[in-house]
């Protein structure tokens, strides 16, 4: 306990010397943190060493702080060391220790605002580096000095307060800080106002910095903004200082009433116009421009019973603009004297002074002008019966001139009359029809016809008035009802079979001259009422039934139809009814009335038209069939025609699928029976692009014999040609048709188109190819002349049979 007490006294003495700043104080306090107590017991580890205080900004360096010693130093040498912030941790090099003496030195100036304390650990080691004592803690506290000025948080503080505010009204608050130790007077701040002008209207709380009003007299119209100079000082007002400003703005209140600049205003207005400005009313207001306390509102107190004037406020100038909302009439009133007042948009403060010119008079003089005519009744509505004849009076659409002091005449004309139906008297405005208006006019909307009439005066600058004339076209019952289509159908012969026949009626007239319709059997024929009955279904339909069984067939009835107009119109109309035999379901039995029903809906003219149409259709079908037949026959006359005209040798045209019979006659027998049908073609032979060319003069085809007497010569020529054919095999030799022959002798096909005309063609060389090409040679070669024809006639006279024309060798066709 004695050692601890001595340690505490030493630390207190050190702190006192440091705080008093005793010059030359260098001897540090010696600490024995490991000294044993008198009872030879060690000091506990948990025993806390009081902090070591050192002032910041100490300039005498190095400065000894403290000396530590170990009790074991008497037994041998001890090495001391320290660790922690300021030694081997940032900031490094602030503290050091003499390892032999244990003295701790301050090597750098301290700044409490950066680091207010350091916690170090002290070690005692022997020369071998072994620990002699347990580590102990050293805490070094940096003592604050008043080395920081206070600082305001803002360079300029702003505040607002209403003008005329009572004393003690809060305005704003100034705030400041000090980096020194807040637990010392170095950071004890005091606020004050250095300057605010005269009189002193504001005060500041020295501790809190709140600014408040201290007396009345704040008037925005006198001073709108106050600029105060504030000061803050530490050491409770005796230390370092700093300054700032406070800008206080006074908010406006409506403490000034608006006033007119004059007691009377004089203006002029033109009659018969509206929506125009007449003049301006000037006012003054000292309150803040643009605020509700400044904006003026005008009221017309007297002189405008009809509400013809209004006053609006110009937002830029705050002047009142007098306007006309209803047209003025010079003839009714030449002068207007208005009494006008002005107030602000915001209510006036109770303590504010009343305005001396809060009201003014406005005198308005009306100028006379040429006004347009005025129709006495506009729009004018009238009615006219449907189908009114031309010249019918419709109405008199008259107008008056409001300019009583100007003697002017009015003239009338049409501006809109789409059907050109009306005629207007230019002097009186009398309107009458000039033709009959069609009920189907597209300009008749809902039974109303609309026209526009103009009235114009004769002034130098004439004015025009527009009037609307609406004419209701009254419906007239001028049409009788008729039976509605479609025509009636069949009716059962039994009175209680089937639904009966539903009859309907229509009427071209509009309501109320149309339905309901009345259906009645003609009273001229009493027998109709005994055989038939009519029952009303609704306003437009009735049902017809037989009273008892009536004969089947066509019955001609007569109905009397009447509408509901005034006066009613009626029409007697015939009705054809077909009566048939019906089954239990009330439907006509098949074929019961088929024949008779055809006459119910067709007249004689319709039947004639139907028959004529059928006959015309039949004639057209016959003409088409004949034309097709002639066309087919004409096609059969061609060069390569059908099997009947095929005269090629053993080349048969079957014109059927699968081929025909193998053995058939290769010649056309009909041509042999009628040799006169074969004649020379008219004109030169056609140019054949698909035939061989090369000879200069083609031979004309041979002429067939015109008489049966020449048949023998013709046959002999055929036999001679067959015998002289080198390609014909011997008799009774099998023919091979699948042999395609040798290659072509010609080396090129360029000779096909080498000629320029038909005269350059020569087809006689085809005869050299054998009898199979004789037909082509006859068609395109030179004619054989009279000698060939004579042989034909000779053969015919010899009476040779057609079979002689057949070749001697016939083979099978592939």
Curated annotation (Swiss-Prot):
Consequence recorded when altering residue 8 to L: In MRD3; uncertain significance
Cytoplasmic side: 627-814
Compartments reported by the entry: Cell membrane
Residues making up the propeptide: 22-60
Tissue: Expressed in the brain and cerebellum.
Domain of life: Eukaryota
Membrane topology: Single-pass type I membrane protein
GO MF: beta-catenin binding; cadherin binding; calcium ion binding
Domain Cadherin intervals: 61-152, 153-260, 261-375, 376-481, 482-590
Sequence intervals crossing the membrane: 607-626
InterPro entries: Cadherin, Cadherin-like_dom, Cadherin-like_sf, Cadherin_CS, Cadherin_Y-type_LIR, Catenin-bd_sf
Keyword set, alphabetical order: Calcium, Cell adhesion, Cell membrane, Chromosomal rearrangement, Cleavage on pair of basic residues, Disease variant, Glycoprotein, Intellectual disability, Membrane, Metal-binding, Repeat, Signal, Transmembrane, Transmembrane helix
Domain notes: Three calcium ions are usually bound at the interface of each cadherin domain and rigidify the connections, imparting a strong curvature to the full-length ectodomain.
Physiological role: Cadherins are calcium-dependent cell adhesion proteins. They preferentially interact with themselves in a homophilic manner in connecting cells; cadherins may thus contribute to the sorting of heterogeneous cell types. M-cadherin is part of the myogenic program and may provide a trigger for terminal muscle differentiation.
Clinical condition linked: A chromosomal aberration involving CDH15 and KIRREL3 is found in a patient with severe intellectual disability and dysmorphic facial features. Translocation t(11;16)(q24.2;q24).
Protein name as annotated: Cadherin-15
Source organism phylogeny: Eukaryota, Metazoa, Chordata, Craniata, Vertebrata
């Amino acid at each position: 306990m004695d050692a601890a007490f001595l340690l505490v006294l030493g630390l207190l003495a050190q702190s006192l010397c440091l705080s008093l700043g005793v010059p030359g104080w260098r001897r540090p306090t010696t600490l024995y943190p490991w000294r044993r107590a008198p009872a030879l017991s060690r000091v506990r580890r948990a025993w806390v060493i009081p902090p070591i205080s050192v002032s910041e900004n100490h300039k005498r360096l190095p400065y000894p702080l403290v000396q530590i010693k170990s009790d074991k130093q008497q037994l041998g040498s001890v090495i001391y060391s320290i660790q922690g912030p300021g030694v081997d941790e940032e900031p490094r090099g602030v503290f050091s220790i003499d390892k032999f003496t244990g003295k701790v030195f301050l090597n750098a100036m301290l700044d409490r605002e950066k680091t207010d304390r350091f916690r170090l650990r002290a070690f005692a080691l022997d020369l071998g580096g072994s620990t002699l004592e347990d580590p102990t803690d050293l805490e070094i506290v940096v003592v604050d000095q008043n080395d920081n000025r206070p600082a305001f948080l803002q360079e300029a503080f702003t505040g607002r307060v209403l003008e005329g505010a009572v004393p003690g009204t809060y305005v704003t608050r100034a705030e400041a800080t000090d980096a020194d130790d807040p637990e010392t007077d170095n950071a004890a701040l005091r606020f004050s106002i250095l300057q605010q002008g005269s009189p002193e209207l504001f005060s500041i709380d020295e501790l809190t910095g709140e600014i408040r009003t201290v007396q009345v007299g704040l008037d925005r119209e006198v001073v709108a903004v106050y600029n105060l100079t504030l000061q803050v000082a530490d050491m409770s007002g005796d230390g370092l200082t700093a300054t700032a400003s406070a800008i206080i703005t006074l908010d406006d209140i409506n403490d000034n009433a608006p006033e007119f600049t004059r007691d009377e205003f004089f203006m002029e207005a033109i009659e018969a116009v509206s929506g125009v400005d007449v003049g301006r009313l000037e006012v003054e207001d000292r309150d803040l421009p643009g605020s509700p306390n400044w904006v003026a509102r005008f009221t017309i107190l007297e002189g405008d019973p009809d509400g013809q004037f209004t006053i609006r406020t110009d937002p830029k100038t705050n002047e009142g603009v007098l306007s006309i909302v209803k047209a003025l009439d010079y003839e009714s009133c030449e002068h207007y004297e208005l009494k006008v007042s002005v107030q602000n948009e915001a209510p006036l403060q109770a303590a504010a002074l009343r305005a001396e010119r809060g009201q003014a008079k406005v005198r308005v003089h009306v100028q006379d002008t040429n006004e347009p005519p005025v129709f006495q009744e506009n729009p004018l509505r009238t009615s006219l019966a449907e189908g009114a004849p031309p010249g019918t009076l419709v109405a008199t659409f008259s107008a008056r001139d409001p300019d009583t002091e100007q003697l002017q005449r009015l003239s009338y004309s049409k501006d809109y009359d789409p059907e050109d139906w009306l005629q207007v008297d230019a002097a009186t405005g009398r309107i009458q029809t000039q033709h009959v208006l069609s009920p189907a006019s597209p300009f008749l909307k809902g039974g109303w016809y609309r026209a526009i009439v103009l009235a114009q005066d004769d002034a130098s600058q004439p004015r025009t008035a527009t009037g609307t004339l609406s004419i209701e076209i009254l419906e007239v019952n001028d049409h009788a009802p008729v039976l509605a289509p479609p025509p009636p159908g069949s009716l059962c012969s039994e009175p209680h079979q089937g639904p009966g026949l539903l009859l309907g009626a229509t009427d071209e007239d509009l309501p109320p001259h149309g339905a309901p319709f009345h259906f009645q059997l003609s009273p001229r024929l009493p027998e109709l009422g005994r055989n038939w009955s009519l029952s009303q279904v609704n306003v437009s339909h009735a049902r017809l039934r037989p009273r008892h069984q009536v004969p089947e067939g066509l019955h001609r009835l007569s109905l009397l139809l009447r509408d509901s107009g005034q006066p009613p119109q009626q029409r007697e109309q015939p009705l054809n009814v077909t009566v048939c035999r019906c089954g239990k379901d009330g439907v006509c039995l098949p074929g019961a009335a088929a024949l008779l029903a055809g006459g119910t809906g067709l007249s004689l003219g319709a039947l004639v038209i139907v028959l004529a149409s059928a006959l015309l259709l039949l004639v057209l079908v016959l003409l088409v069939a004949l034309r097709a037949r002639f066309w087919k026959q004409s096609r059969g006359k061609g060069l390569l025609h059908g099997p009947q005209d095929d005269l090629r040798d053993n080349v048969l045209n079957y014109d059927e699928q699968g081929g025909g019979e193998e053995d058939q006659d290769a010649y056309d027998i009909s041509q042999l029976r009628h040799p006169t049908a074969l004649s020379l073609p008219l004109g030169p032979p056609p140019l054949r692009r698909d035939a061989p060319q090369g000879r200069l003069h083609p031979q004309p085809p041979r002429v067939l014999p015109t008489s049966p007497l020449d048949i023998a010569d013709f046959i002999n020529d055929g036999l001679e040609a067959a015998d002289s054919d080198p390609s014909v095999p011997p008799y009774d030799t099998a023919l091979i048709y699948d042999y395609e022959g040798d290659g072509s002798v010609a080396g090129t096909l360029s000779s096909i188109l080498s000629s320029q005309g038909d005269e350059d063609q020569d087809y006689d060389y085809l005869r050299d190819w054998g009898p199979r090409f004789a037909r082509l040679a006859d068609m395109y070669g030179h004619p054989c002349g009279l000698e060939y024809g004579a042989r034909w006639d000779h053969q015919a006279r010899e009476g040779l049979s057609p079979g002689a024309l057949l070749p001697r060798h016939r083979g099978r066709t592939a």
